Amino acid sequence: MPELCRFFGIIIRMYAEPEAPHHVPHFHAYYQDHVGIYSLDPLELIAGTLPRRQQRLVEAWAELHQAELLADWQLLQRGRRPHPIKPLE
């Protein structure tokens, strides 16, 4: 699963799912032993949990980069490598 970004101890990854077109565009956020899965449109936590502070950071980052996340989703579903996305600073 390609890593798209890393910031404040959070790792953002996205899976290619060419055999599962029924899945909504989404990404995975990892922080220590926690995993949160976020849909892209609408942008919301759909599975898993993150500590509240990290959840707010991921949501702020995803709002800033929603178009890039959607573009990376399309690339992955076509078997192409996604582009890295700038982290929060």
Where are these regions (language model features)?
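Short connector loops at helix/strand junctions that flank enzyme active sites
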Residues: 7-9, 22-24, 33, 57, ...
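Intrinsically disordered, low-complexity boundary segments flanking structured domains
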Residues: 1-2, 25-27, 71-72
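Generic secondary-structure boundary/loop-capping signal
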Residues: 1-4, 11, 35-37, 42-43, ...
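Short, charged/polar N-terminal "headpieces" of proteins
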Residues: 1-23
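Low-complexity, charged, repeat-rich alpha-helical/coil interaction segments
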Residues: 8, 45-46, 53-57, 67
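C-terminal structural segments of small proteins and small subunits
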Residues: 57-89
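A short, structured beta-strand/loop element
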Residues: 15-53
